[in-house]
Structures are given as structure tokens and as C-alpha cells.
A protein has these predicted regions:
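Short beta-strand-loop/turn "lid" adjacent to the catalytic site in phosphate-handling enzymes
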Residues: 66-103, 131-136, 167-188, 211-216
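Active-site core segments that coordinate phosphate-bearing ligands/cofactors
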Residues: 8-10, 109, 116-129, 136-139, ...
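Short, conserved phosphate/pyrophosphate- and ester-handling motifs at nucleotide-, phospho-/glycolipid
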Residues: 49, 105, 245
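Short, glycine/charge-rich flexible loops or terminal/linker lids adjacent to PRPP-binding catalytic cores
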Residues: 105, 220-224
Length: 490
């Protein structure tokens, strides 16, 4: 039974909670508890009950305690990384006024377009926040709520992000971090604070918002007696400020000021995401210029349709996902839930180039290709935001770190390798978000740099898979990219 200090990193994602129990001294993952929660909504709506997140967190921690054999007295800290952008509206008792509007809720697309123009266009927004409003940003959801459900907006005593809500349940304090705050549309990456003019623009009182901690690894407070009783953990252990899921993944992979800078990562999950940690503040309208959890920055591009969309195509075709073949002449853009990058909230899936000889396996392969090209197109923009020339020989040969559920899928890996032409590194952990959250918890409990801790854990654990580059499939790239350009131009 472990006797060394243990921390818990919670990944509260779109559909589940995971709680990773990690030895601080070694980085050894002792157990990962899991619990599901539901997402509801039809059309463009995607909502979830924040109380279900709290229930799933409790269940995941209980499972992890049981499976790891860790005595509760060994746990010294906990931190939450949550799905970004969600709008959580609370009443005076801290209970949700309504279900949370999630990151992939696209109903606020008209509000995003209106807000972009009201401030003076994309450049005005990136100059302040690093990002142009799209339907995923929290500010657009608040504007939508005020227009469509004014009573709910008027009832708000507090406005939180998903991870803020859970951190407050743990520590009893209202706190967020620069990383997750930078995905709201009302936090300025230029000033490092909430932007009063933007809050006025959307009609949001700053008094409803949490305090912004210096970093995600800052100790926000201590586990309250009520939370300790609910979780079976000691009261008084460190609770870190926590961060958003993408920022936590960067920490878990050792990206940041205390680790790797300007090295790209591709995450294949419900969404497809490409990002890198850098010291340069990103201001490109082509991507989201987020702050990172450690005081650096995280230029990031995210697509709405990745593994879940391809799984749906496989189900429609009656195929196993591993039976896919290269798409041949067919192009399938799996934009089943609209799309964020490019910004096409009303888009639907499209199938182009069918022939008599086209097989179901090729159609499925084309879905993989459509999803991968969509997210890889943003890779060059991320590298430029880091101040790099994507075509430079050293930069173009820089390995691409592949994480997320898709990194465990043979055809996902083969498709990324073929269409990127880059060497791939697949880290051993399947849970970089939870590991990153655990590193933040360790930082809060020890005072050490979370990124440095995560790097040390990686070195101790080992097991990274290295795949050399293959010749890039430029024909497929050009064919799919042209279809994306046509979709984006209307």
C-alpha cells in the first residue's frame, strides 16, 4: 500500500469525470476512477446539469480510492480541469438556475457574429482577448441567455465556468485561473484581468465572476469539511485553482515555461484540438489565443467534429471503425454538429466524389480524412502564433504529440501520420488532462512548478511511442482541403 503523498487530478469532461490518483514523488498513476454524466439537447442545444458533474466527481474519487488502495490520509491535494467555455449560472444558494450551456452548444452563433461587429471586427477582439467570438465562447452564451431567457439571467447570483463550479464545491471559494478565463470572451490576455468594456458590452456584472488566481497551480484554498465528508478525504488538503481541459493537457504533457515551448500537440477526442505552449501572446483571428495555466500562452484551434462524429459515420455504415480504408476519390466532411474551425455553426456533413467503385470502407476512411485535415489545417497557424515559420526545415520536422482517445486508435494514428508527414510521439498516459490536473494539485500542495513536476513524472514513467515520418499524402490533403475551402466560402 502506498505511503507517499498522493494527489488527485480530476478531468471533468463533456460526458464523464475521471479522477487520477498519482504519487507525487514518482508520478506513478495508482488508479483512475471514472463516472459518466449526461448531455442533453436537440438541434444546436447542448446542455448538462452541473449537479451531475459534482455527483460524477464524487463517484470517480470514491472508485479511485477503492481501486488504488490509497489511505485517504495520504492524499495531500486535489485539482479540477474542466471542459472549457460552459456557462454555469447559479442562484444565491450556489445551485444552478438552469442547465449549463456547453462549449458545443451552437445556439449563440448569431450573438457571436453580432458581438464581433459591435467591438469593431475580429482584430479588435484578438487585440484584447486573443480570440474572435464564436458560438463556443462563454460571452456569446451569456448574450444569448439575456436575449432568450432573461429571467434566468436576472436570477444569476454567480456566473461560473464548469471547473470553477467544481473548485468552489471543493474549497468554498470563487476562483478561476487565467487559462480557463481566457476562453470566456470577457477576460483580456493583454491586461491579465477581466475587461470592463467587454463586460458592459454583454451586460455582465463583474461582481458575479470568480477571482482570477495567478496560475492554475495556485493554492485556491483548502478542502472544506462538507466536501471532505462527501469525498471521503481529509479536510484541509490543498485545492488548486485548476484550469480548463486543454490547459491541463498541456501541463500534463510537460508543455510550458518549465518544460517544452513551441512544440505542437494534436488531441483527438470528441473535439479535435491542436495547440502549443509559447511565451508570445497570440493575436491571430485564425485561432484561439488562450492563456496557459502556468503564465505562458496557449494558441489553440479546436474543431467540433472528431472521434464522435467518425464513430457516428461508422455506425451509419454498419462498420467497425478499424475497417476503414483510405478514401480514394471520395471526400466526407463530418460536420455533424456544425463546425468551429472553420467557423461554420450551421454546417452539416457532406459527401463528395462517390463512384461505382467506392466502398463503405473508403467512405469511412474519408470521414477520418475529413476530420484530420480540418484540424491539421490549423497547425501552421498555431506555429506562426509561436513566432515560427511552419515551412522551416527544423520546424516542419518537429514531432507532433498525439493524445486523446484517437491516439489509441490505429486508423486515427495512420491517418494523422499520412496527412501530416511529421514524426509522431504518443505519450504513455491516456489521461493527460487528469495528469495535468494532478500536477496542479501537487504544485498547490508542495509549492513546486507543476510543469516541471509533470516533465519529471514523464521521464520517470517512460514509454513514449515514437513513429518516424512517412511521405505526406498531398493528393488527399489537397482534395479535402479544397472541399473545406468551398464549404467555408458558402
Amino acid at each position: 500500500m502506498p505511503t507517499q503523498a498522493v494527489v488527485i487530478g480530476v478531468d471533468s469532461s463533456t460526458q464523464s469525470a475521471k479522477a487520477a490518483f498519482i504519487e507525487v514523488a514518482t508520478g506513478r498513476v495508482l488508479a483512475v476512477g471514472r463516472a459518466a454524466h449526461e448531455v442533453s439537447g436537440a438541434g444546436g442545444a447542448r446542455e448538462s446539469d452541473p449537479e451531475a458533474w459534482w455527483g460524477a466527481l464524487r463517484e470517480a474519487v470514491a472508485y479511485g480510492l477503492k481501486e488504488s488502495g490509497v489511505p485517504a490520509s495520504s492524499v495531500t491535494g486535489i485539482a479540477v480541469a474542466g471542459q472549457q467555455h460552459g456557462l454555469v449560472v447559479l442562484d444565491g444558494s450556489g445551485s444552478p438556475v438552469r442547465p449549463a450551456m456547453l462549449w458545443n452548444d451552437t445556439r449563440s452563433a448569431p450573438q457571436a457574429a453580432a458581438l464581433t461587429g459591435e467591438l469593431g471586427g475580429p482584430g479588435a477582439w484578438t487585440g484584447r482577448t486573443g480570440s474572435v467570438p464564436v458560438a463556443s465562447l462563454t460571452a456569446t452564451k451569456w448574450r444569448w441567455l439575456r436575449e432568450h431567457e432573461p429571467r434566468a439571467a436576472e436570477a444569476a447570483a454567480a456566473v461560473r465556468l464548469p471547473h470553477d463550479f467544481l473548485t468552489e464545491r471543493l474549497a468554498g471559494v470563487a476562483v478561476t485561473d487565467p487559462g480557463d478565463a481566457s476562453g470566456t470572451g470577457w477576460y483580456s490576455t493583454k491586461t491579465g484581468a477581466y475587461d470592463p468594456e467587454l463586460l458592459d458590452l454583454i451586460g455582465l456584472d463583474a461582481g458575479l465572476l470568480p477571482t482570477v488566481a495567478p496560475t492554475g497551480g495556485t493554492r485556491a484554498g483548502s478542502l472544506t469539511a462538507a466536501a471532505a465528508d462527501a469525498l471521503g478525504l481529509p479536510a484541509g488538503i490543498a485545492v488548486a485553482a485548476g484550469t480548463g481541459d486543454n490547459m491541463a493537457a498541456a501541463v500534463g504533457l510537460g508543455l510550458g515555461g518549465g518544460g517544452l515551448l513551441d512544440h505542437p500537440v494534436l488531441s483527438l477526442g470528441t473535439s479535435g484540438t491542436v495547440f502549443a505552449a509559447t511565451r508570445a501572446r497570440p493575436v491571430s483571428p485564425a485561432l484561439s489565443g488562450f492563456a496557459a495555466a502556468d503564465g505562458t500562452y496557449l494558441p489553440l484551434a479546436c474543431t467540433l467534429n472528431c472521434t464522435l462524429a467518425v464513430d457516428r459515420i461508422a455506425a451509419l455504415l454498419g462498420l467497425s471503425r478499424d475497417t476503414a480504408e483510405a478514401g480514394g476519390e471520395v471526400v466526407l466532411l463530418p460536420y455533424l454538429d456544425g463546425e468551429r474551425t472553420p467557423d461554420l455553426p450551421e454546417a452539416s456533413g457532406s459527401l463528395i466524389g462517390l463512384r461505382h467503385t467506392t466502398s463503405r470502407q473508403q467512405i469511412l476512411g474519408a470521414a477520418y480524412e475529413g476530420a484530420v485535415v480540418t484540424v491539421l489545417r490549423a497547425l501552421d497557424e498555431v506555429l506562426r502564433a509561436c513566432g515560427l515559420d511552419p515551412a522551416g526545415p527544423e520546424v516542419s520536422a518537429r514531432p507532433l504529440r498525439l493524445v486523446g482517445g484517437g491516439a489509441r486508435g490505429r486508423h486515427w494514428v495512420e491517418t494523422v501520420r499520412r496527412l501530416s508527414g511529421r514524426p509522431l510521439l504518443i505519450p504513455p498516459t491516456a489521461e493527460p488532462v487528469a495528469v495535468g490536473a494532478a500536477a496542479l494539485a501537487a504544485g498547490a500542495s508542495t509549492g513546486n512548478d507543476p510543469v516541471e513536476l509533470a516533465r519529471a513524472w514523464q521521464s520517470a514513467v517512460g514509454g513514449t511511442v515514437e513513429l518516424p515520418p512517412v511521405e505526406r499524402d498531398t493528393a488527399t490533403w489537397s482534395r479535402v482541403s479544397a472541399a473545406i475551402d468551398r464549404a467555408a466560402s458558402g
